[in-house]
Amino acid sequence: GLIVDSKVTRKKPLDPLASRLVGYYLDEGTRTYRVGLEGGFNDHVLKGEDGLREVQRIQKGLWKPVNLDNTKEPRDGYDLVTTIHSNIQDITHSTLSQVLRQYRAERGLAVVMDVQTGAIRAMSNLNMNPDSTYSETYNAAVADLYEPGSTFKLMSLIAALEDKKVDTATTFHAKYGQYKVYDKYIYDSRKGGYGAINLATAFAVSSNTAFAEMINEGYKGSAQAFVNRLYSMKLHEPLGLPIEGEQAPLIRYPGDKGWSGLSLAWMSHGYELLMTPLQVLAFYNAIANDGRYIKPRFVAEVRRGNQVVRSFDTEVIHPSIASTKTVKIAQRLLADVVEKPYGTAHKLYDKHFPIAGKTGTAQVNYQLGKENVDYVSSFVGYFPADAPRYSCIVVVHRPDKNDKIYGADVAGPVFKSIAQKVYATSPFVDQVR
């Protein structure tokens, strides 16, 4: 006779899109691999129950059913409905891939998030393979801790405004584009610096020296007050995602190992601290959401067939990360980065489609000397600037140093292209949970 042993395997119909986020579950007996949503939801949602049938051994290795009916029927697992929007995911993946190839970057990522609900509409993580092609092998958006560089100036800005250390008219006078802390110097990217500039302009031009002066002088003798303010905005806590791999941010407290007299000045513009790209995006999303800090959401609901078994609602991390006044100032200054002719992202300006955000160009391996320095280019913000619907972060690691390296040149165009294509082709995506 014939005994059929059937097995069910899971396929990724949109592979390679979001393949690392969709993930997999693999049980090899001695070790279990849990990646992405499948890894996180396999045991209690996706995994079904085996059935039972009474069989009789007729000879070694051969069995026959005793009855035609099962003593216990197998039960399929539930279906998981994600928040990913296939069109937005396709746009994000293809746009990021094109720019990574253009700048021969080591890797890059892009994430699109719904401002009001926290729903992740797209997530692409691409790494260069040995043959110079790109594929998803690691979820850097969730798991990669990095120094965010100038994109952290938003956090420093809000802290200083909330603690009334400055206002937007406060003037900074760093000479020759450099600021000295003990025997170390912080430099502006513009040779010779910007002269005397106020805080609003310093944010638009992304002056490292102005922000170092603002935080180092403003919190002199009270470094713990600066870190306490960051902690009050939940910046030191992980997001608590339903998939494995998220790293907790590293924001040192005065007295911790690694803290020094240089720490305030370096933290002011995104060094000596570590965050994941998704943690940075969630904070910017809070500014777009008028201060309401919400948890990124990957899953809309669990279903069995057409029946909804469970819905996943928006989770609030902090109802208001700052005062309404401070949030409004931050929104205006983020728009100025793009709108003002002197803003670092002005080349992304389009009067018909305003976007708001912040550029970042962080150095890596700077401890090894100038010849070993590489760069991480980033842009994070939201669109449209005047009525935010989506927030987005783009991070590109190690673009070719012989080509463009700045956030406005490498990551910024990815953001703008995603924003324009998403808004042109998916105007009603908010109807999808």
Enumerate the predicted regions with their spans.
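Structural motif corresponding to the C-terminal cap of alpha-helices
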Residues: 95-103, 128, 338, 400, ...
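Beta-lactam-recognizing serine transpeptidase/beta-lactamase-like catalytic domain environment
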Residues: 58-71, 110-149, 155-398, 407
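Small/polar-residue-rich segments within soluble enzyme cores
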Residues: 1-76, 394, 413
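A helicase ATPase "motif cassette" and its flanking acidic/Ser/Thr-rich regulatory loops
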Residues: 92, 202, 415
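Amphipathic, well-packed alpha-helical segments that form the structural scaffold of globular domains
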Residues: 46-49, 81, 93, 97, ...
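Short, charged, low-complexity patches
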Residues: 34, 85, 89, 280, ...
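Conserved, well-ordered alpha-helix/loop/beta-strand core segments that scaffold catalytic motifs
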Residues: 65-108
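Short, gly/Ser/Thr-rich active-site loops of penicillin-recognizing serine hydrolases
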Residues: 308-316, 412-433
